[in-house]
């Protein structure tokens, strides 16, 4: 079993009187893609923001066996990267310059920074936009650009890296949805990264994730493999939706279909 590199214990959160997360315990392992799933308002993005520190808290959260609050920001930035659901940037940077921002924690020359940024821009299919102004890009192009930025940020992390992605496919077309999740899976399998990704598409999650964590009304109701997690009974409980689960005709993962 792979090493636990990110853990959260007894995580609870309220917004006013509303319970958003209710006593969540979660372990994230190196070399695996873990997908956080659930309906709107289930607590997926809030949990991810707590795990990465975007929402400050005193919860028992540890990276590589060391409590989150004991990490120096300069050190954690080399090992832990977060791609938020929305990235607000209005200054007219070149697209390439936005990706180069990911290299700020690294000790690189300007030439090395540009070379690295272009490498990840090629992976995310935004190389042709390198000299374009960031505000002129579409939502999907910006999303792929920021994926290149966080991949750049983790370039020097060795095998101690945690990549967190909050709905990274929400603005993408079909081909780029798959390419984004292939990049995430490749990081897990070839670089031993621990990848945590918030998704809505159960079939994408089933195809690319090793583990599915299902949230419902702020509670963790399942943490298991796709085959064990995606049962019609559990899907109906979590999503109030009747479904049929079948095996993909050529690949070994379950697919979810409407029951009627």
Show which residues each predicted segment covers.
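Conserved structural motif at the start of ABC-family nucleotide-binding domains
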Residues: 6-8, 20-23
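Conserved ABC ATPase "signature" region
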Residues: 112-129, 151
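Conserved ABC ATPase signature
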Residues: 133-137, 141
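Conserved ABC transporter NBD signature motif
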Residues: 59-69
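ABC ATPase nucleotide-binding domains
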Residues: 231-232, 236-260
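The feature captures the beta-strand-to-loop junction immediately N-terminal to the Walker
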Residues: 37-39
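Helix-to-loop junction immediately C-terminal to a conserved catalytic motif
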Residues: 52
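Catalytic Walker B motif of ABC-type/P-loop ATPase nucleotide-binding domains
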Residues: 160-167
């Amino acid at each position: 079993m792979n090493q636990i590199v990110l853990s959260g214990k007894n995580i609870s959160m309220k917004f006013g009187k509303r319970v958003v997360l209710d006593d969540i315990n979660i372990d994230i392992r190196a070399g695996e893609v873990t997908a956080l799933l659930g309906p709107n308002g289930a607590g997926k993005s809030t949990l991810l923001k707590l795990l990465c520190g975007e929402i400050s808290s005193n919860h028992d959260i540890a990276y590589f066996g060391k409590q989150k609050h004991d990490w120096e920001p300069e050190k954690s930035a080399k090992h832990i990267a977060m791609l938020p659901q929305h990235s607000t940037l209005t200054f007219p940077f070149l697209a390439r310059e936005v990706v180069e921002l990911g290299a700020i924690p690294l000790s690189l020359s300007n030439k090395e920074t540009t070379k690295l940024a272009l490498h990840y821009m090629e992976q995310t299919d935004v190389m042709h936009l390198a000299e374009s102004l960031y505000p002129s890009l579409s939502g999907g192009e910006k999303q792929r650009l920021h994926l290149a930025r966080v991949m750049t940020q983790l370039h020097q992390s060795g095998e101690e890296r945690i990549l967190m992605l909050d709905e990274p496919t929400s603005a993408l077309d079909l081909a780029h949805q798959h390419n984004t999740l292939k990049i995430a899976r490749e990081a897990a399998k070839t670089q031993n990264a621990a990848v945590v990704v918030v998704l809505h598409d159960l079939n994408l999650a089933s195809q690319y994730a090793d583990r599915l964590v299902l949230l419902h009304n702020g509670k963790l109701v399942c943490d298991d493999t796709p085959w064990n997690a995606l049962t019609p009974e559990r899907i109906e409980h979590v999503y109030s939706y009747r479904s049929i689960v079948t095996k993909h005709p050529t690949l070994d993962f379950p697919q979810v279909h409407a029951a009627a």
